[in-house]
Amino acid sequence: MDPSPNTNEALTETRFSDLKPPLSEDIIEALLRSGPPGFEFCTPVQAATIPLLCSHKDVAVDAATGSGKTLAFVLPLVEILRRSTSYPPKPHQVMGVIISPTRELSTQIYNVAQPFVSTLPNVNSVLLVGGRDVRADMNTIEEEGCNVLIGTPGRLSDIMERMDILDYRNLEILILDEADRLLEMGFQNQVNSIISRLPKQRRTGLFSATQTEGVEELAKAGLRNPVRVEVRAESKSASLTNSKIPSGLHLEYLVCEADKKSSQLVDLLVRNKNKKLIVYFMTCASVDYWGLVLSKIPALKSISLIPIHGDKKQNARDKALASFTKASSGVLLCTDVAARGLDIPGIDYVVQYDPPQDPKMFNHRVGRTARLGKEGRSIVFLLPEEEDYVEFMRRRGVFCQEKKCSEEASDVIPIIRSLAMKDRAVYEKGKRAFVSFVHGYKEHECSYILRWQSLEIGKLAMGYGLLHVPSMSEVKQKRLSSEGFSPVEGVLKFEDIKFKDKSKEKQRKQNLQAKKEKLEDKKRERDKKNSKKAVNASSATADSKKRKLTGKQRQTIQTAEDEEEMARDYRLLKKLKKGSIEEDDFAKLTGADDF
């Protein structure tokens, strides 16, 4: 029988120790050791799901972001392995597989699972994600063995295909986390490949924040008579039918001109300097730029600013997330790479500096705060021409309250421009971020509301603190107006702006010199070709004129040319006698070397 929807409360009155079938004492002790006091009690999704999986039922779980889904499948996995007839397993006998869409989420699941998997003697779990050498993973598996695979679809399917040593015949449980995201990111083929290698006699748990046709099809193909678990968490300011938003979340929007956005952002960060915030930008280049610029603004010096996006190397992303997770306050600057699944504790505020390209990501972004029943706030910055986005979200069941611009916000544009004039890194990253934003804006799924043709490009460039509006086809072709941009007074030539990093500046100068020499070579080659063409044209013209002259006129011209040639040879002969030129040069110039 399907369990009925749970209440809005973050925690139920059900203790983990009261669940039936009962969890082992090792698990209960690990729960009390690894979590806050709340780990004594279950969240609704945990109370509903754990008994079902432990009773050998397949489940399709539709639950809110931040509802405690990870423990809802990690604990049953450990218990099922403990009770398996194949326990303890052989070193390369795989008994459990957990698939998630991103490296960060997989890493987080692995870290959550470790304290509980460690209660099983002779059971080893391994994390398999991209961004590192696959051969290193294979060597680890061969040497240490693995019984639980946790990772992303690409790396998991790759390892499965390469390693015949792995035995799946006694696999007990498969977990598909963030199933909707797995499909959205194009992992359908890899997921199917993984499932095809596993025995049909297994338990399967499918967890998803949204229900789509693709998820339903995946559930039909991968689950057997699943019990559907639906946990609702209605927000005070939002209610969705296709995606859940945490309770206790207060949603706001702020409308301001493009040239005021950065100042409003800095003001908001200063006012919340003792809190933990996530700020979302549209592009990787924007994260790079604002991560650099904001860290240099005096008012933000005391705030820890940590940028992360999909183009960063995996090690750098892992370190950044670990640093932010441990911190009690600070700001994570990111793209949507961190919008799903990451369980970062204690997020107080989510700021969407740019509306997401995919409107579904709005809910996943704001779901980083107000987790497990706590209070949280979220705000989305909108340009005046984007205000229809509020009504668009309202029709999707998301209700945001308007927040007025802070009249006390200091103008940070002069500071940013000053930074750009002193460091080419700021200057170039600013241009790159600006161009990437405009191009990204053109790809909006809500293009009928967020129209790139309506962007006030001049004000936007001011908001980025740029020294000039970058050269773009959209501006050149007059499709976007650069009105509202104020040139910097007394600015030096832009090509003279230097990198503060001496090695980068040295490389830049070398590149400039090489470019200059290349241009000069091209110019000489072009001049040579043009000169040759001119001589040929002149000769052809002269010949044509000669043919039109009388015999006497042609004879007169020829005599003059001969006299000029004799005079030139005489001048060269005098230079030869004085030693001004060598004999070889004289021979070449007079044509004597032809004889």
Residue ranges and their predicted role:
Residues 1-20, 25-26, 32-35, 84-93, ...:
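Intrinsically disordered, low-complexity, charged terminal tails and linkers of eukaryotic nucleolar
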Residues 2-275, 282-285, 292-303:
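SF2 DExD/H RNA helicase N-terminal ATP-binding lobe
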Residues 135-140, 288-295, 301-339:
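Conserved helicase ATPase core of P-loop NTP-dependent helicases/translocases
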Residues 151, 334, 352:
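Short beta-strand and adjacent tight-turn residues that come in two discontinuous sequence segments
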Residues 228-238, 254-259, 353-356, 379-384, ...:
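Conserved AAA+ ATPase "SRH/arginine-finger" region at the nucleotide-binding site
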Residues 340-355, 377-380:
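A short beta-strand element within the Helicase C-terminal
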